[in-house]
Amino acid sequence: MKKIISKVFAGLLAITCLVGCGSTGTGTTSTTTDDGIKWDKEVDFLVVGYGLAGASAAVEASDIDPNAKILVIEKMSEELAGGNSIASGQTFVVPSKDDVETFHTYLKAMNEPNPIPEEYSSWLAQEYADQINWINATMENCGYEVGYVGGGPLRWGSLVVEFGNLPGADFKGTSAHIRKKDSGSFMAGGLWHGFNAAATQRENIEISYRTTCIDLIQDVETRAILGVVATTADGSTINIKANKGVLLACGGYENNLQMQRDFHGVDNVRTSGTPGNTGDGIQMLMKIGAQMWHMKNQTQSGGYWLGVAVPDFESTFILNMTFKSGSYLQVDAQGERFYNESKTYHRQHMKDLKYGKWLDLPHEEALPVWFIFDETLRAGDSVVSPWLSWPITTEHYAWSSDNSAEVEKGWILKADTIEELAEKMGYEPEAIRATIDRYNGMVDKGVDEDFGRDPETMTKIENGPFYAVEITPTLVATTGGAKRNTKSQVLDWNDEVIPNLYEAGELGSYVSNLYQNGVFLSEAIASGRAAAQTALGGKSTVTSEVTILEAGETANTSFFKDVKDGTYEVQITGQHGEFTLEVKVAQGKVSLIQVEDGADNMFMDEEQFAALVNSIREKQDLDVDTISGATQESQNVLDSIRDYFTK
């Protein structure tokens, strides 16, 4: 046996895994066992990768056996841990237990034309409905809470269904979120922070950072995975034995350009998620003969987001999805417009309905692509999203609301004339001038004759200076990996289990085609827990019933009931600057909310603001839905009012 294992280790498994492996710390004693391997550390359950799937698995394993030795090993530093879950939209989907079959129908429809086994999708739909009470209890125990992603408690019907033309799209569900207890509002990175808090408070979970997993160790006769080889932060190489199994929760290959070219067939694509996902788990899985699936797909429905790449960050920013000014357009490699720039593609994760199918936007084929705008947009709109992407959520870069800092850095090109701007972009000045002139002419006509852009979103590009930023096709994560069953066990090409090897999260996801917002983070939790349950032979009994209100139902509370009568000035720090609201309260009820100063800085129109105010007055509470098209700004208003009256 010694000879067989050593051959596997030295030859068959000589691959590099740069994702999610942890150091053992000081004082570790090495032992040599009957299998002929010198083990430097021995644990019961080893988790490779510390994102949402890995954290969920560790917490579930600790619930099952508080005495089990659980080691989570992570490639990134502690400050940059969390995987793509920390850079995501922070939503997980919860279907009603009474409507699981309808939701299952929707899941199956989204996975066409690349269906997964029906028993898999059926299991997933049921887990999404069942796991909410475990999540709720887990968060209650560590100072966090589950609520609606738009603020306040969960409410049926609050979920935005992205593909309403598919069978099952009328399922009953809600968009759930995790935030600090009693905060009542959206929390950036909330899911990750909540599960990180749950994991770090458990004494039998060890988390090691800045360590590299370089091999799986496998018994070639039984095919069982015995453990891993890792290099620690100080450069030492160690062998870690995992008696009950190894879970690979180390993400996809979005930061491996060669894999992108090989599997997606793209020339150039970047990521707005963690820079740590470079396909290392995929290499390990392929080396041991795991059956691979979904290698072309990614978590954003296969649609590429519009990224802004800058020299200072590995990951991209995300181009803003809406703008107050319409003085912008995008051009392709020939300097011409190539699609309708103003549609709400982000509501279908950057897909467009064409020929009766949800297809990718054409940016990858149109490269290079540039976003051109004028001084009006520059001064009034942030070019990038202020709440999405790794540089913002994790590396905490604050993009200036008027883009001035980024112009100064040279990230955004600036020129006094369109012709000068074209030269800086590398285009023929006549080509860009012709495109701008045609666009401006259609603004005068009140109709986009080329691509049907809503004239309400079109403003002349005429107020110099003029600006341009290059657009890079961007994704958050890939979903390819090994095929896994509902126990999160990795399968070979004969659909047989590879013993003691598990997989969860993005790596080998069940998402094979379209992606509904919230499905992926829900799967990370479900698959991570399934791996722990299989490896440790049990299931957590931790549970706490969560209250989910019916659509239109209130929580029978009034936020303003204890507020003294009076008129208050509430300062709002919005997406594009500060503005002041006048809030009048009489007899414990809010009677008026209006903009007193700084209306030009408010990133929502009058109709959207009126809808938000009406919701607050109708419920006499801040537990209201955010407004479509102004989600972040409505949340800023709700948070600021809440903070003002509770400080």
Question: What is each of the regions a protein language model found here?
Answer:
Residues 37-53, 71:
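Beta1/beta-strand and adjacent pyrophosphate-binding region of the FAD-binding site
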Residues 63-85:
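Glycine-rich FAD pyrophosphate-binding loop
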Residues 126-236, 257-258, 305-307, 443-463:
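Conserved redox-cofactor binding core of oxidoreductases
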Residues 215, 224, 431-510, 595-598:
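A glycine-rich dinucleotide-binding beta-alpha-beta segment and adjacent secondary-structure elements
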Residues 233-309, 521, 527-530:
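Glycine-rich loop(s) and the adjacent beta-strand/alpha-helix scaffold that form part
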Residues 282-284, 291-424:
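An anion/pyrophosphate-binding glycine-rich loop and adjacent beta-alpha core
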Residues 450-480, 548-593, 597:
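Structured beta-strand/loop patches that form or line metal/cofactor-binding pockets in enzymes
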Residues 559-647:
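Active-site- and interface-proximal helix/loop "cap" or "latch" segments in soluble metabolic
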